[in-house]
A protein has these predicted regions:
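Helix-turn-helix repeat elements of alpha-solenoid scaffolds
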Residues: 39-57, 78-93, 115-135, 170-182, ...
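Acidic, serine/threonine/proline-rich low-complexity intrinsically disordered regions
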Residues: 166-173, 255
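Cross-kingdom TIR/SEFIR domain
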Residues: 1-14
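Alpha-helical linker/edge segments of TPR/alpha-solenoid repeat scaffolds
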Residues: 117-124, 160-167, 206-218, 248-252, ...
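Conserved structural position within tetratricopeptide repeats
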Residues: 64, 97-98, 137-141, 182, ...
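Long, ordered, amphipathic alpha-helical scaffolds
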Residues: 228-304
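Amphipathic alpha-helical repeat scaffolds of TPR domains
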Residues: 21-57, 64-81, 99-121, 143-166, ...
Length: 304
């Protein structure tokens, strides 16, 4: 619930995806923000800067923020996330009126963007990352946690795992991976319809070599993905998730089919990079266990 905006029976991870379809609010501003998110790239191929300026123009036009309806404020926040303007997203959330800032949805997105900015900082901003975890812990303590809360919490530790793994600190990496698994498990148990913590839970089990447990869980996650695809038009991440699950189960012919379905739905090249990163992890960990990695290598090459 966000000040009169209800997501009854919705999967928590889908709140930001379905928000614009489910919530009635100022149609003119809604269209202005839709245009802002899709401003064409400039002559140098840079679309992001122009889109940020366009969103900021909408904010300037209707501020102060206290006079803007709650749903529009949420759309602005999601718009910054949609275009990956994470610094601007964080700055905007901090300016939100208190009654909006303290809602569960905004607090979850606040934790998400704190972790994203903290992890991308050079050097890593541990203070920001710790604040992200504190936000999620407060939601849990207050009984407001959702599968999305735990999914974001798992992502904090998965990012810590990635940093430790890339720096060659395998001991720390394994410890962080186990913590990520714990929160992804909590998220999927909280709501088995939410495939996001589910697929990450399965992937963590795969990386830790707990294959049998991963295979027992996998059909439930696959069902959750397909159920989501029946609720709304499939997107890139739906097929990418099915691809990853098929790889874990060694169904490589199906994995290739899912890849072919996913490719036309990728609206940004970084989407392929995310999938390649996940597949590379599975491949590297299997290689360390002396397992066959050739089929995974072929899929990675197909991603370009």
């Amino acid at each position: 619930m966000i000040k009169g905006i209800s997501f009854q029976n919705s999967v928590a991870h889908e709140k930001t995806d379905v928000f614009r379809d489910k919530v009635q609010y100022n149609a003119f501003i809604k269209n202005e923000l839709a245009y802002a998110r899709n401003v064409p790239a400039d002559v140098n191929g840079d679309a992001k800067a122009g889109r940020i300026r366009a969103i900021n123009s909408v904010i300037e036009k209707y501020k102060p923020l206290e006079n803007i309806e709650t749903a529009v404020l949420i759309d602005i926040m999601i718009s910054f996330r949609n275009i990956e303007a994470f610094k601007e997203m964080l700055d905007f959330i901090k300016q939100m009126p208190r009654y909006v800032f303290e809602t569960v949805m905004v607090q979850e997105q606040y934790a998400f963007v704190l972790n994203r900015n903290g992890g991308k900082a050079k050097p890593t901003d541990e203070v920001m990352i710790n604040e992200a975890e504190a936000v999620l812990r407060k939601l849990e303590t207050e009984g407001k946690a959702s599968s999305e809360t735990y999914g974001i919490w798992g992502r904090i530790y998965k990012d810590k795992f990635d940093r430790a793994y890339k720096s060659g600190n395998t001991g720390e990496a394994k410890g962080q991976l186990k913590k990520a698994l714990k929160y992804y498990e909590k998220g999927f148990e909280f709501d088995p319809r939410d495939a996001y913590p589910g697929v990450n839970y399965v992937t963590c089990l795969e990386l830790l070599g707990e294959r049998q447990k991963a295979l027992r869980l996998l059909p439930a996650v696959e069902y959750a993905v397909k159920a989501k695809m029946n609720r709304k038009a499939p997107d890139y991440w739906d097929y990418a998730t099915l691809l990853e699950l098929a790889v874990i189960e060694n169904r490589f012919a199906e994995a290739e089919e899912f890849l072919n379905e996913a490719k036309p739905l990728a609206i940004e090249s970084w989407m392929f990079d995310t999938t390649k990163g996940n597949l590379n992890l599975i491949m590297n960990f299997r290689n360390e266990r002396n397992e066959d990695i050739d089929p995974i290598k072929e899929l990675i090459l197909s991603l370009g």
